[in-house]
């Protein structure tokens, strides 16, 4: 049984690696840390032009209609080069929720705009410093109006929309909101890694649209997160491999006592 990536998937990964290396993505990430933008707009625009944001989106909406393995190889290279773009929040989380659970009207409205970059999305669940669970969701929705505050939302400032995990009289819901509405307030929150900014989102009677069912929102959220965990793992594989490669190269180039330090048993 061959569990390796296909030739097409390997080619896609090689092209992604070549692109991100050429764009000097690691240095771009350093530059982002020195600003308050939390995004390299130029790099993000080029990624959108390459069609990466439409990898999982079905062809009928203008996407490439590819599978998760294609997304995995892209994720590995994004992690390898620490790309300062909202790819994970918008593609792994937001786009996947729209593809799998939104109604046809929302799909037709949102998916083509995700491909073009007109829409950038994120997913908001956490409300306090405890692990999120359906028992501690406080943000409420009534008559399609959302009230409450989410914290630790990745890339919220650069996103145009978000999907919120909310509570209604029927149970836990997933709700789509537009950040352009005047009732939405987004504020930056300090965190350890500013290359991927995190923010709070506060809603005060914010209009929303239902994603999925009225009562099974938590199960849908868990499905999205479990799937995204694989993609985040591929990002970590890419980052770990880059660290290992740097260490090996240093051990070959650094000399001590007239020989490369990599030749010493301790190294």
For each feature predicted by the language model, list its residue ranges.
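Glycine-rich beta->alpha junctions and the first turn(s) of the following alpha-helix
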Residues: 3-12, 80, 186-267
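A short, Trp-centered hydrophobic/proline-enriched beta-strand micro-motif
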Residues: 116-128, 164
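Structural signature of FAD isoalloxazine-binding scaffolds in flavoprotein oxidoreductases
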Residues: 65-74, 133-136, 177, 203-206
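Cytochrome P450 C-terminal beta-domain/meander region
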Residues: 133-147
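Residue-level signal for inorganic ion chemistry
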Residues: 9, 20, 74, 103, ...
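A short core secondary-structure module
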Residues: 124, 147-184
């Amino acid at each position: 049984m061959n569990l390796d990536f296909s030739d097409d998937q390997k080619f896609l990964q090689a092209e992604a690696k070549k692109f991100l290396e050429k764009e000097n993505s690691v240095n771009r990430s350093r530059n982002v840390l020195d600003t308050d933008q939390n995004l390299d707009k130029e790099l993000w625009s080029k990624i959108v032009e390459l069609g990466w944001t439409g990898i999982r989106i079905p062809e009928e909406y203008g996407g490439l209609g590819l599978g998760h393995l294609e997304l995995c190889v892209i994720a590995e290279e994004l992690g390898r080069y620490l790309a300062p773009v909202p790819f994970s929040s918008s593609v792994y989380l937001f786009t996947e929720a729209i593809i799998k659970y939104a109604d046809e009207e929302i799909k037709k409205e949102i998916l083509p705009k995700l491909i073009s970059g007109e829409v950038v999305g994120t997913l908001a669940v956490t409300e306090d410093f405890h692990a999120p669970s359906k028992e501690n969701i406080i943000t409420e929705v009534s008559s399609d109006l959302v009230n409450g505050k989410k914290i630790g939302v990745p890339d919220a400032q650069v996103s145009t929309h978000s999907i919120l995990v909310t509570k209604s009289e029927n149970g836990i819901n997933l709700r789509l909101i537009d950040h352009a509405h005047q009732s939405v307030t987004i504020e930056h929150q300090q965190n350890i890694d500013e290359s991927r900014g995190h923010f709070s989102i506060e809603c005060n009677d914010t209009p929303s649209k239902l994603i999925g069912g009225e009562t099974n929102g938590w199960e849908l959220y868990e499905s999205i997160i479990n799937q995204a965990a694989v993609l985040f793992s591929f990002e970590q594989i890419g980052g770990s491999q880059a660290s290992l490669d740097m260490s090996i190269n240093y051990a070959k180039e650094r000399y001590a006592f007239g020989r490369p330090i990599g030749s010493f048993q301790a190294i």
